[in-house]
Amino acid sequence: MDFDQLTTFVYVAKLKSFSRAGQKVFRSQSAVSAQIRQLEQAYRAKLLDRSAKSVELTPAGEVLFDYAERLLRLRDESVQLVADRGNVVQGPVVFGANEATCLYLLPDIFAEFQRKYPQVHISIYRNFSHKILQRVEDGSVDVGIVTLPLKSPNLKVHHIYKDRMRFMVSSKNPLASRNEVTLEEVAGQPLIFPRTGFTRQVLDKLFRPYRSRVHVAMELPSIGMIKRFVGADAGVSFISESFAKDQVKAGEVKLLSVDGVDLFRELGLVYRRDRSLPRAAQALIGLIREHKNLSGSPDPA
């Protein structure tokens, strides 16, 4: 058993195909089959079921798959950590964040990071916070930014950002002449909600007492779309203050306070406690922590 065989096995399991796995590892289908046979002989067990239309893991194969992924990650980590003993910060970093964080909070930080460490390659995994947490915990993502709070004894968490959520209306909306409204007034407006995610959960809870009269006019998949539709006066919404700076400056929308309502979105930087991170990942963590609270809001921790 060697790393090449394990790599081939992992690709076959993921792609459910010998031929497609062969393309990934630059081997013929017969060579891939030979490597799998050698693994099955070494473990004295059938690892893959080839009888179905696609290749499936057997129970023994599922056990080996988990170990194979861990072994390959440990190999990559060890190679990187040995390389890190030199003076140059280099190598890959896999970073996880949701779309809004990638669009509105990270570009300036990542641009500065690339200027400082041009030999580091950053790969971004974009998804919801719970998916990012899963990837950080299984080791396939080095560092992530997720919505707080969270409870995980396996993760180190640094609070880095706190942003107030405000009520957003078009500059054409009559409410734009005001600085503050009541929640009852908001409930009477055509609401635009995000389809899923943290903000949707917060808004569903906020408007629960007004359920009988709330009119959710639209559910949209991204913050960018919500801003455009609110700007066109197709409805109203709530948004993190920093995500609408450009639209407020351009006069397209106005952000209002809601009497008696204080909503915040908090973000944390997360990585595994038990993992030795490469210097490139450590450098990125350090830079992000230097830039914490760019919104100017107080740090509660």
Q: What is each of the regions a protein language model found here?
A:
Residues 189-210, 277-286, 292-299:
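Secondary-structure junction motif
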Residues 11-28:
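Short helix-boundary/capping micro-motifs
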Residues 18, 40-59:
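A short LG(V/I)-centered, amphipathic sequence patch enriched
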Residues 88-153, 211, 220:
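Central regulatory/effector-binding core of bacterial HTH transcription factors
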Residues 42-43, 64-86, 295:
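Alpha-helical linker/hinge and terminal dimerization helices associated
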Residues 105, 171, 254-298:
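A late-sequence structural motif
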Residues 128-141, 146-147, 198-255:
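Hydrophobic hinge/microswitch elements
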Residues 152-191:
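Flexible hinge/capping segments at coil-to-helix
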